[in-house]
A protein has these predicted regions:
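Amphipathic alpha-helical "stalk" segments
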Residues: 1-44
Length: 44
């Protein structure tokens, strides 16, 4: 397994241990999108 790093904002990262199941992969993708949306919303 290996870790992947996703930069959500300049000060926020999400680290994910791969591989994931298809279901968990979809949930992590949704989590990252929502985190980016929330942080973008608060920076305006």
């Amino acid at each position: 397994s290996q870790w992947e790093r996703y930069v959500v904002d300049e000060d926020v990262e999400i680290h994910v241990k791969r591989p994931l199941s298809h279901v968990k992969n979809r949930r992590v993708d949704a989590l990252i999108q929502e985190a980016r949306r929330l942080l973008k919303e608060t920076s305006q």
